[in-house]
From Swiss-Prot:
<comment type="similarity">
    <text>Belongs to the short-chain dehydrogenases/reductases (SDR) family.</text>
</comment>
<keyword id="KW-0443">Lipid metabolism</keyword>
<protein>
    <recommendedName>
        <fullName>11-beta-hydroxysteroid dehydrogenase type 2</fullName>
    </recommendedName>
</protein>
<feature type="transmembrane region" description="Helical">
    <location>
        <begin position="52"/>
        <end position="72"/>
    </location>
</feature>
<dbReference type="InterPro" id="IPR036291">
    <property type="entry name" value="NAD(P)-bd_dom_sf"/>
</dbReference>
<dbReference type="GO" id="GO:0043231">
    <property type="term" value="C:intracellular membrane-bounded organelle"/>
</dbReference>
<feature type="compositionally biased region" description="Polar residues">
    <location>
        <begin position="384"/>
        <end position="397"/>
    </location>
</feature>
<feature type="transmembrane region" description="Helical">
    <location>
        <begin position="26"/>
        <end position="46"/>
    </location>
</feature>
<comment type="function">
    <text>Catalyzes the conversion of biologically active 11beta-hydroxyglucocorticoids (11beta-hydroxysteroid) such as cortisol, to inactive 11-ketoglucocorticoids (11-oxosteroid) such as cortisone, in the presence of NAD(+). Cortisol is the primary glucocorticoid in teleosts and is released to increase glucose bioavailability in order to meet the increased energy demands in response to stress. Functions as a dehydrogenase (oxidase), thereby decreasing the concentration of active glucocorticoids, regulating the hypothalamus-pituitary-interrenal (HPI) axis function in adult fish.</text>
</comment>
<feature type="transmembrane region" description="Helical">
    <location>
        <begin position="3"/>
        <end position="23"/>
    </location>
</feature>
<keyword id="KW-0472">Membrane</keyword>
<dbReference type="InterPro" id="IPR020904">
    <property type="entry name" value="Sc_DH/Rdtase_CS"/>
</dbReference>
<dbReference type="GO" id="GO:0008211">
    <property type="term" value="P:glucocorticoid metabolic process"/>
</dbReference>
<feature type="transmembrane region" description="Helical">
    <location>
        <begin position="341"/>
        <end position="361"/>
    </location>
</feature>
<feature type="region of interest" description="Disordered">
    <location>
        <begin position="382"/>
        <end position="414"/>
    </location>
</feature>
<keyword id="KW-0753">Steroid metabolism</keyword>
<dbReference type="GO" id="GO:0034650">
    <property type="term" value="P:cortisol metabolic process"/>
</dbReference>
Amino acid sequence: MEDFAVSFWIYIGVMSIFVGGAVKKFLAFNIGAMPSVVVWLGATLLVERLCALCMPAVLARLVLCVCCWLYFTWATPKPSLPVEDKAVFITGCDSGFGNATAKKLDAMGFEVFATVLNLEGEGAKHLRKVCSSRLTLLQVDITQPQQVQQALLDTKAKLGIRDLWGLVNNAGWCVNIGDAELSLMSNYRGCMEVNFFGTVTVTRTFLPLLRQSKGRIVTISSPSGEHPFPCLASYGASKAALNLFINTLRHELDPWGVKVSTILPSAYKTGQSSNAEYWEKQYKSLLQGLSPNLLEEYGEEYLLETKELFQNYAKTANEDLSPVIDTIVEALLSPQPQVRYYAGPGLILMYFICSYLPLSISDRFLQKLFVQKKVMPRALIKQQGLSPNDNNNSIKENMNDSSSNNSNFTKCID
């Protein structure tokens, strides 16, 4: 009976350690170590059984103490590296994450090289106004290799004999308001040019400096590159390609001492996402680019609903960018940065469902989470013998419901 009591309390103690560690990670919205959490749980259960079956009480207590020590060693954050004499190159600083990161790093004392598409744009003017003289603005379109090469020369000239510590790949592009079949080929090519080829160009160009400093590469990607969000085929495909490139690079640069991290944010208001004129322009461009046959099969009302859903979804996205910015800082300054960071609310539930539950559940979850379409394509209505009036009613219902539905569930794409 005494052995049973000891085993029971050992079990309770070790399980408390596991639950505490898991809750700590969940509250931090960081499930990058989700597989390690599962391993930790399995090891906990195994230790409990071994304690119950094989070990005397004294040894069982010793095992519990070792588990406690391992947990606190694992859970206690290590001190950050010093900021002094560290320079960072950031792409896509006209707005959004890039603009906010440039301001944050400059305020911390970094020397910042911030790229913008337009040196006279509002984003560049704002950075000049609020940042110190340590910040250097560079006009760079990352899809133009000549401009990227010139940015390298300008950066090296400004640094002199000093090192470049970090590269933050932030520049990205998302133009898509339709199904994969409806998306224009220019959207697919545009997303790949910026999100994949542009980022590859910048990374390869600056790698010699980063290898020399044994520095950091931090890349902003998206959960849509790992999960099939409806209506994001072109954007998601480009981010999927980017994820594989960055992961491959991480293995190859490990012998050089370069740490590579990927950040996967939830939904935030960045760029043109909350601009009604922007969505209207994309909608008209889509109508003009579709073939008459395809437009007839889907119907203009189907496209209109998709546009309205995207627009309403963007309105409810998170305006506070600090979770992503703080994660970028951690990836740059942590002695042992994580391979993947999940920045923002809602990602815990989404990744758990998509990683551990059956596809039938995860697919339905993604459909309900993102764009909840009610309007059916015209061709499907004819096949099923429904009335076209049903679509008109669905549009009205969806427009009334979409805002409340989106705000009731935290969004999980950037």
